[in-house]
């Protein structure tokens, strides 16, 4: 094999090996969060379960916080971020609301135990898990403010509801905690939860002309 071809092959092999190692580490984090949701994330346990050295985790992710950031991004992608992104890009703000709630509900349902563990562990380990959750919440906070403003611009908010108040209400209704309570304590299926949350948005925020009759 020619030297240049050999180098390219070796580079590709190293990249594939690094990617496989990264996948094993992220899978080990997933297992840790589902098996020990009340315990702080242990890099020693993650490394052991992934079959790598602790130093490999630092080499791949930089830090514990970097590992959790990467895990959160992977979690969003695997549980349905693309569908959520598509839903909130709709030109009709009411479809933005409906589709966004359906997509977010399905995301939470796809990995309910992991999302619950992340939000719980953020309070136990704010320096690492907390950073990943804070970023998730910061993105959602901006999304709710944008959505509330879109509703106001479309003259859909009922009298007496400010943009800020609408954002607060949307924040509550689209939270994981609201989904988890309805799924776990009330036993509702994901599509039932999405339908109920969408009706609640209409009842709480929309003026009479904006509410579409139920079929």
What name fits each language-model region?
Residues 60-61, 70, 147, 196:
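Residues in the recognition helix of alpha-helical DNA-binding motifs
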Residues 106-119, 128-154, 164-168, 195, ...:
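Amphipathic alpha-helical packing segments from all-alpha helical-bundle domains
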Residues 70, 83-110, 167:
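Hydrophobic alpha-helical connector segments
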Residues 43-45, 72-80:
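Short, basic, alpha-helical segments at the C-terminal edge of helix-turn-helix-like DNA-binding modules
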Residues 33, 68-75:
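Alpha-helical DNA-contacting segments of helix-turn-helix folds
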Residues 152-200, 208-215:
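Hydrophobic/aromatic-rich alpha-helical bundle segments in the mid-to-C-terminal region
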Residues 55:
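Key DNA-contact positions within bacterial/archaeal DNA-binding proteins
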Residues 1-51, 59-60, 65-66:
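Basic, helix-initiating cap at the start of DNA-binding domains
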């Amino acid at each position: 094999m020619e030297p240049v071809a050999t180098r390219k092959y070796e580079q590709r092999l190293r990249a594939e090996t690094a990617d496989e190692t990264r996948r094993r580490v992220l899978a080990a984090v997933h297992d840790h969060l589902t098996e020990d949701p009340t315990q702080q994330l242990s890099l020693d346990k993650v490394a052991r379960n992934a079959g790598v050295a602790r130093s490999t985790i630092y080499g791949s992710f930089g830090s514990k916080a970097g590992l959790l950031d990467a895990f959160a991004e992977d979690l969003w992608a695997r549980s349905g971020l693309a569908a959520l992104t598509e839903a909130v890009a709709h030109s009709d703000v009411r479809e933005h609301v409906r589709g966004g709630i359906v997509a977010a509900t399905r995301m939470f349902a796809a990995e309910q135990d992991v999302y619950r563990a992340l939000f719980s562990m953020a309070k136990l380990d704010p320096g690492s898990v907390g950073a990943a959750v804070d970023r998730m919440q910061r993105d959602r906070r901006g999304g709710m403010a944008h959505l509330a403003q879109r509703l106001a611009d479309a003259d859909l908010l009922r009298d007496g509801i400010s943009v800020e108040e609408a954002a607060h209400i949307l924040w509550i209704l689209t939270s994981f905690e609201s989904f988890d309570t309805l799924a776990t304590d009330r036993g509702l299926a994901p599509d039932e939860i999405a339908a109920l949350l969408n009706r609640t948005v209409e009842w709480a925020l929309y003026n009479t002309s904006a509410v579409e009759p139920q079929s």
